[in-house]
């Protein structure tokens, strides 16, 4: 049986192959334990060469990218081509797995409902927040329609997988069967680092600097406060960038020499080493589903502070959380973390207890239960049409 996976992630195409940091071929093994092969519908970006790493297509996995779709603005002039391309993929596949929030995913859900085809969803974030806090006027305009589309896409699904334990399932209930707390973390490290702090304090944050919802502005303002108090701080941003907006903001707050834009870190070992060289990890997001970067930071033994947005409280204890945009509280938490080794040790110990439940084997068992439930629904759907997919 072929499973179609639909999501907006931008895969990079070089010659006849496809590459992605977040969606390497290894990711698809989550689903290939139950389904025979996969077809992927996503956005695409053609590249000449560059960082050709983390191949996504391969054995049992093929791509049919939606070339007409670049951003939500593409819907204005190319909606017909986008709908046609998705419809072809949906009809030629036995099952459809939609990851939301995503525009392609919302469209795929509408098509499935129209042709009465059962589909399942993976809910990894909140649509309204993702668009409202994106940083553009167009994003704010789209936030309510996208929230409506996500609520309906999830409600009408046969099976829903949620990456959080409560937050997303409460926000987006499903009329079908729900599977909660199916984290999308790829690995959980078990590293104990030295928590001593030297003269220079290294603080890290992961997230694209081309969107506002990862809270880079909150981090810059907070670091500015601490630098003004006399601390020698280096704030490192990992992810797409640098963006002109946050470079100018760092300059405005007189911390341009304290803020380092490191860009993407493709290699997993290099990323773990980056974490282990930090004194503190912060995630001041305005919205989150289940933040993998937080789990990776905690697993690498880094004291971690985060906003209480979305599912962050699944991983980070209440004492180390602050409200989104609360620069004052974040500044106080960082200050206390710097001054007290005991506080840092308690942070790591308590947060590690929270992520100890992310046993990858157990998560995969639960994911496979969801996939098997969906596979049975598909079989029943085709048997009602006189087609035996197991023959």
Curated annotation (Swiss-Prot):
Keywords: Capsule biogenesis/degradation, Exopolysaccharide synthesis. One of its GO terms (molecular function) is glycosyltransferase activity. CDD domains: GT4_PimA-like. InterPro entries: Glyco_trans_1 (IPR001296), Glycosyltransferase_grp1 (IPR050194). One of its GO terms (biological process) is capsule polysaccharide biosynthetic process. It comes from the Bacteria. Pathway: Capsule biogenesis; capsule polysaccharide biosynthesis. SUPFAM superfamilies: UDP-Glycosyltransferase/glycogen phosphorylase (SSF53756). It holds the Pfam family Glycos_transf_1. PANTHER family: SULFOQUINOVOSYL TRANSFERASE SQD2 (PTHR45947:SF3). Required for the biosynthesis of type 1 capsular polysaccharide. This is Protein CapJ. It comes from Staphylococcus aureus. The gene is capJ.
């Amino acid at each position: 049986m072929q499973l179609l996976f639909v999501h907006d992630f931008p895969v990079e195409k070089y010659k006849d192959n496809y590459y992605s940091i977040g969606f390497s071929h290894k990711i698809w093994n989550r689903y290939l334990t139950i389904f025979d092969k996969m077809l992927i519908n996503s956005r695409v970006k053609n590249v000449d060469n560059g960082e050709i790493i983390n191949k996504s297509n391969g054995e049992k996995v093929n791509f049919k990218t939606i070339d007409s779709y670049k951003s939500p603005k593409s819907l204005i002039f190319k909606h017909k081509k986008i709908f046609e391309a998705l419809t072809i993929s949906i009809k030629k596949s036995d099952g459809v797995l939609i990851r939301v929030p995503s525009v392609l995913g919302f469209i795929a859900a509408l098509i499935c409902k129209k042709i009465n085809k059962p589909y399942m969803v993976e809910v990894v974030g909140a649509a309204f927040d993702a668009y409202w806090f994106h940083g553009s006027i167009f994003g704010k305009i789209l936030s309510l329609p996208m929230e409506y589309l996500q609520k309906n896409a999830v409600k009408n699904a046969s099976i829903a997988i949620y990456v959080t334990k409560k937050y997303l399932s409460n926000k987006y209930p499903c009329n079908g069967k729900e599977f909660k707390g199916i984290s999308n973390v790829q690995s959980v490290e078990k590293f104990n680092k030295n928590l001593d702090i030297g003269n220079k304090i290294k603080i890290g944050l992961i997230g694209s600097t081309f969107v506002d919802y990862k809270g880079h502005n909150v981090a810059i303002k907070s670091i500015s406060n601490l630098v003004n108090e006399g601390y020698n701080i280096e704030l490192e941003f990992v992810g797409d960038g640098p963006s002109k907006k946050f470079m100018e903001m760092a300059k405005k707050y007189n911390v341009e020499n304290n803020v380092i834009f490191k860009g993407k870190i493709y290699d997993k070992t290099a990323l773990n080493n980056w974490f282990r060289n930090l004194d503190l990890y912060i995630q001041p997001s305005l919205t989150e589903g289940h933040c993998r970067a937080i789990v990776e930071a905690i697993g690498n033994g880094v004291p971690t502070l985060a906003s209480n947005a979305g599912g962050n409280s699944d991983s980070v204890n209440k004492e180390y959380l602050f409200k989104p945009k609360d620069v004052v509280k974040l500044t106080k938490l960082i200050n206390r973390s710097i001054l007290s080794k005991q506080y840092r040790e308690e942070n790591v110990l308590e947060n590690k207890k929270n992520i100890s439940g992310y046993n990858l084997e157990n998560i995969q068992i639960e994911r496979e239960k969801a996939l098997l439930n969906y596979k049975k629904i598909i079989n029943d759907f085709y048997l009602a049409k006189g087609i035996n997919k197991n023959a």
